[in-house]
Design a protein with these regions (language model features):
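Structured catalytic-domain cores with a bias toward divalent-metal coordination
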Residues: 1-324
Length: 324
């Protein structure tokens, strides 16, 4: 990193902090942005929170970290956007950008000539991915999603990118991590360009709990320490992530009312009832059973369940860790 950071017409001198709004070109929308250019040379960490506007703990954590961290505590440069999907945030909309109905996380790398979601993705991928050395995408369960904390790292790019991403995922204070084989999404696209990346899931169901915010702040501090960017001590961890494999994303076969029998974080046995879909008169339409023994990472807690809704995500815990 040079003495001065220049990005999107902004100039941030070494040893200074900038808190401002970043305009999305050809729109009236501006993203809250914090850039902390540390007093000493080092890596650049890019953090996005609120790509989905209803996922609150990561947004609140990024806001508070941007307020509290000072340049004298940072080696390198910390860039945070909070929230990226500012329109969805104020509208309290789950998943989508209200102006175009698109899932922002599904349109990367974006396009500057299309709609707001595409322009936002392009702004990030074209201006910020190239200057970053590591990327963290902060998520939660959305308004209709309850989850147990876990982290994704990309498994599709080069072995070197996967190894770097996984090494950072391992410093988080959570029980599980997942090697993603997907190619879509902001962090997977970033990894495909050579940028080591992770996606963290913590909190959800439209809640913004103090304990989730604080845990998320500890996550980011641990990452900063891992990247040798942070000079302040971090709290000791209670957990070290273990790999969860063979993920099953159970979809609703029909529209109906979902009554779940399990919760995120539960262990289930093969053949165990996960839940059932009824009609609006309470008559059971379909009962869903676990296809394998494993841990529940995610449950839809909502009663209303349109066809295709992801009801449960669960997988098997890897018996041995490659790095243990």
């Amino acid at each position: 990193m040079s003495e001065t950071l220049n990005v999107c017409g902004l100039t941030i001198e070494r040893g200074t902090k900038l808190r401002t709004y970043l305009p999305i070109p050809d729109t009236n929308v501006k993203i809250p942005l914090t850039i902390i250019n540390g007093e000493n040379d080092g890596p650049t960490l890019l953090i996005t929170a609120g790509i989905h506007g209803g996922e609150y703990p990561g947004i609140a954590a990024a806001m508070e970290l941007g307020r509290d961290i000072e340049p004298e505590n940072v080696t390198g440069c910390l860039i945070m956007m909070h929230p990226v999907n500012i329109q969805g945030f104020w509208a309290r909309r789950e998943m989508i950008v209200p102006e175009d109905g698109k899932n922002l996380n599904r349109v990367f790398p974006g396009d500057p000539t299309v709609t707001l979601a595409d322009k936002t993705a392009y702004l990030i991928s074209n201006n910020f991915f190239p200057i970053a050395d590591f990327y963290v995408d902060m998520h939660s369960g959305d308004i209709h999603e309850s989850l147990h904390p876990y982290v994704y790292y990309p498994g599709q790019p080069t072995p070197e990118i996967e190894k770097k991403s996984r090494s950072v995922a391992r410093v988080l204070d959570m029980e599980y991590m997942v090697r993603s084989l997907a190619t879509g999404g902001a962090y997977n696209y970033a990894a495909s360009t050579g940028l080591p990346s992770i996606l963290i899931e913590r909190g959800g169901a439209g809640l913004c709990l103090h304990e989730d915010i604080e845990a998320y702040k500890d996550d980011i501090r641990n990452i900063l320490r891992k990247l040798k960017m942070f000079s302040l001590p971090v709290k000791p961890r209670h957990h070290s992530p273990r790999d969860v494999e063979n993920l099953i994303y159970l979809e609703a076969l029909e529209t109906g009312c979902w009554l779940h029998h399990i919760h995120s974080g539960d262990f289930v046995e093969e053949g165990q009832v996960l839940g059932r879909i009824t009609d609006v008169f309470g008559n059971t339409l379909t009962t869903y059973y676990a296809e394998q023994t494993g841990v529940i990472l995610y449950v839809c807690p909502a009663l209303a369940s349109p066809k295709g809704t992801i009801l449960v995500a669960y997988g098997t815990i890897k018996e041995f860790d490659d790095e243990d």
